[in-house]
Amino acid sequence: MIRITSSKKSNSLLDEITALSKIRNALLNDKIAKKICKEKGIGEWFLAGVPIKFDKIKQSAKTVDSYIILNKSLLKKPFDIMMRYVIHELTHSIQHVQNFRKKDTKKENEEYLDKDTEVEAFKYQVEFDAENRGQGKAEKYVEDLLDYHKIKGKERADKRDELLDEPR
């Protein structure tokens, strides 16, 4: 007797394309993404063209020369978690475009959470998180971030207040 079976294999390329389509649609309609564009002085058209891809990287997401790169592991996370990283990296993407070819070596030596570019991106990310997942979860995320970077004492309280405040 011959038995024929099939297994449903995940089509990772199709999964990525589906997620990218959903991300693009969300960006075009998200009020935080639109706010970032407005406050950074760039048209909302940027949301339709910002390059985004999935790749195998160590961190959850990063931006290189304005290209947003998301860790493939985010495909397994809830969409609002994926989008909070997209919002953070969108800020960096615009920063890259606006500062094209400028390099500030002074800032390279700053602690990660002391860099103005990171503070700005995290503020938008936390605002997105608060609106989409609730203020409590946004605050927990900030606490976890401060734990991860081993920030303690008065510096921790100051950084927490800074990150939970609205972006300038």
What spans do the regions from the language model cover?
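Post-HEXXH active-site segment of zinc metalloproteases
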Residues: D80-R84, H96-V119
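Short active-site segment of divalent metal-dependent hydrolases/proteases
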Residues: I87-Q95
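Short, conserved alpha-helix that lines the donor NDP-sugar binding/gating region
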Residues: F122
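Active-site scaffold of zinc-dependent metalloenzymes
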Residues: G49-D80
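Proteolytic processing junctions in secreted/extracellular precursors
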Residues: I2-K8
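Long, well-structured alpha-helical subdomains associated
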Residues: D80, Y112-D114, Q125-R168
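Glutamine-centric residue-chemistry signal
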Residues: Q95-H96, Q125
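Zn2+-dependent metallopeptidase catalytic core
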Residues: E16-E44
